[in-house]
Amino acid sequence: MYERRHERGMCDRAVEMTDVGATAAPTGPIARGSVARVGAATALAVACVYTVIYLAARDLPPACFSIFAVFWGALGIATGATHGLLQETTREVRWVRSTQIVAGHRTHPLRVAGMIGTVAAVVIAGSSPLWSRQLFVEGRWLSVGLLSVGVAGFCAQATLLGALAGVDRWTQYGSLMVTDAVIRLAVAAAAVVIGWGLAGYLWAATAGAVAWLLMLMASPTARSAASLLTPGGIATFVRGAAHSITAAGASAILVMGFPVLLKVTSDQLGAKGGAVILAVTLTRAPLLVPLSAMQGNLIAHFVDRRTQRLRALIAPALVVGGIGAVGMLAAGLTGPWLLRVGFGPDYQTGGALLAWLTAAAVAIAMLTLTGAAAVAAALHRAYLLGWVSATVASTLLLLLPMPLETRTVIALLFGPTVGIAIHVAALARRPD
């Protein structure tokens, strides 16, 4: 009797997972249709992000822009950590589709994300007297409030993205990304029109945290994905997510939170710091923003090819390397002119610096790839160790007694190689 009930439960579960994916074409994570959907959404999201940064840089003086950039970076660190929920949810949902389901506890990822987001918001707000004065030199309490609420919202948003990726709902996945970016752009545009100043851009940075609610209200497919359960209890899910969240937080320090890292390791940023931060942001965005947006595709791809860990890395790595090579050439030849024309004479940098910063972006992109492969293989400790080691190495390199531009390039170029080596070594080991 137990075997019959167990088989019936497995069949019911399989039907449930199939129903969620039944409304769209059966395309895989790197099939042409899937990549096209996410790629188009990413292009729109990148355009919105670039426009927000452009509006802030044009509307604010360099010294004030560096204040905005530090908040943007702090939010990036916190919300980047929530990508651990995206990764773990994608992996768990994907595994449910490709492996047999045994009887036992089930977890609702979106509810867990709500609990994690609430705890994170309370911790950020409660601990803010210890660190906010040093980090937020203007608009301190507004920054703390927006950061706390924004993180709670982005926890739920990342989990919904992970569920959509796990069941190949790439149209809704892309729509959620675009909704987030468009909301931010709309608030930034309003800040320009009404002369809101720095506060307006702080609101713009966090406004996208409500996008997941709008998606749930508008899309039955999103509601179906959000209702999915994964094997194991809450403790099992949280243990796996904890490694991913910690590692994603470390990755966010290098990817989104680098202005914060510069602030911590420098006496004063000033106008020069604002120019360097803008250069770092613009040279890495063409690679890292799309790559971050396609984390769901990548993890689903690596899960599907988990018996060929290193071979599955080759094609994405070649694409990243090719784009990076073209980007280095373009940044070196046209970057200084584009900065001068687009952002004004206060933002002047040399072509060599822009080319080297683009090379550094390639290094971080490769680390992002190997990290996604490690998550897909359930190598949580290796994933965590790789990103934390890369972040520590980059931080130490930023302390070198060199000009700001030089140590920035060295830190962003060589720090990630430590993490890449750790990830590749773990992936090279024979699966158990």
From Swiss-Prot:
Which locations, inside or outside the cell, does it occupy? Cell membrane
Provide the topology term for how it sits in the membrane: Multi-pass membrane protein
Can you tell which superkingdom this protein's organism belongs to?
Answer: Bacteria
One MF term in GO for this entry?
A: host cell surface binding
User: Keywords of this protein's UniProt record, alphabetized?
Assistant: Cell membrane, Membrane, Transmembrane, Transmembrane helix
User: Is Cell inner membrane a UniProt keyword of this protein?
Assistant: no
What InterPro entries would the database entry show?
Answer: Poly_Biosynth_Transport
The portions of this protein that span the membrane are 35-55, 60-80, 112-132, 144-164, 185-205, 209-229, 242-262, 274-294, 313-333, 359-379, 384-404, 408-428
A Gene Ontology CC term for this entry?
A: plasma membrane
PANTHER family per the UniProt record, alphabetical: O-ANTIGEN TRANSPORTER-RELATED (PTHR30250:SF11), PST FAMILY PREDICTED COLANIC ACID TRANSPORTER (PTHR30250)
Give the family from UniProt.
To M.tuberculosis Rv3630 and M.bovis Mb3654.
The identity of this protein, by name, is Uncharacterized protein Rv1510
